[in-house]
Amino acid sequence: MRCSHKLGRFLTPHSCFWWLFLLCTGLSWSFADGNGDSSTYQYIYNLTICELNGTDWLSSHFGWAVETFVLYPVATHILSLGFLTTSHFFDALGLGAVSTAGFVGGRYVLCSVYGACAFAAFVCFVIRAAKNCMACRYARTRFTNFIVDDRGRVHRWKSPIVVEKLGKAEVDGNLVTIKHVVLEGVKAQPLTRTSAEQWEA
């Protein structure tokens, strides 16, 4: 578990890290020097969505694909501010779609780069989903506040205030003799005792 925690912290600096890197690469393509025969020019071209322009899948819809490619990471980043796990899922989904399109179109360099990013985003999603499930399980099955009576029975108790009647505590309508009170997982000590009066009309 410790290894997975470090891996998740390494891979998730931000939800849109991989998208931002690839977007900057695409912008740098516009300012690259040289002509179409330049190896640097061609290398940068292979790493952007422009590589899909000649495929059958995207040749007739390239305009909206570019708009989606720019707006999609912005949307996932905004989503990550409140829903990080969902953002990781959509990151993996979007990157996987580009990788699949590259594989179908025979653009294997593009496919491998985006596939690696999609896999990293999916790993982040799995780690976050596992942590969410563990947190939900802990919240539903682990209780840190409870009362132990003189018979060894454990009673759930949320309040730091215990009401006593005839020297016993009233728990769920029953009177029990307190042996220990545990708050936030730590054995508690009585702080103050206050007498109370009950009035009826």
From Swiss-Prot:
One Gene Ontology CC term in the entry: viral envelope
Protein name: Glycoprotein 5
Record field: transmembrane: 64-84, 109-129
Virion surface topological intervals: 33-63
GO term, biological process aspect, one: clathrin-dependent endocytosis of virus by host cell
Stated role: Major envelope protein present in abundant amounts in the virion envelope. Mediates virion sialic acid-dependent attachment the sialoadhesin receptor SIGLEC1. This attachment induces virion internalization into alveolar macrophages predominantly through clathrin-dependent endocytosis.
Assembly and binders: Heterodimer with the membrane protein; disulfide-linked. This heterodimerization is required for transport to the Golgi complex. Interacts with glycoprotein 4. Interacts with host SIGLEC1; this interaction plays a role in virus entry into host cell. Interacts with host B4GALT5.
Superkingdom: Viruses
N-terminal signal peptide: 1-32
Main location: virion
Membrane topology annotation: Multi-pass membrane protein
Glycosites: 46, 53
Description of post-translational modifications: N-glycosylated.
Pfam family, any one: Arteri_Gl
Hydrolase among keywords: no
Record family assignment: Belongs to the arteriviridae GP5 protein family.
